[in-house]
Amino acid sequence: MINTLTGMKIDIHRRTFAIANKTGGMSGPAVKPVAVRMVYQAAQAVNIPIIGMGGITNADDALEFILAGATAVSVGTANFANPYAAKEVAEGIENYMRRYQVEDIRDLIGAVR
């Protein structure tokens, strides 16, 4: 559904494109609201597993995707800054489930209607 949004960067001092191909893929936290919406819309339209990705940097981000309908999530860009990001996301989800007494993560999938 979404990998990146096409973006452009201009070097104002050289008055030229800062990216060799003029445009490039913008990913990470900037695309998360779009990605969450797309997961939600897909989950409403089909009954197949959906992997939520795009801007997940912590457990709260991952939980947004799960509540929107993702059956799994993927951590991408955050791994560049923190090689433990995926582990921390998983631990954060476990903490959330304990805090809110959720026994089965499937109870969270698509819980936002």
Region locations from a protein language model:
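Contiguous, function-dense segments enriched for cysteine-driven chemistry
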Residues: 38, 77, 107
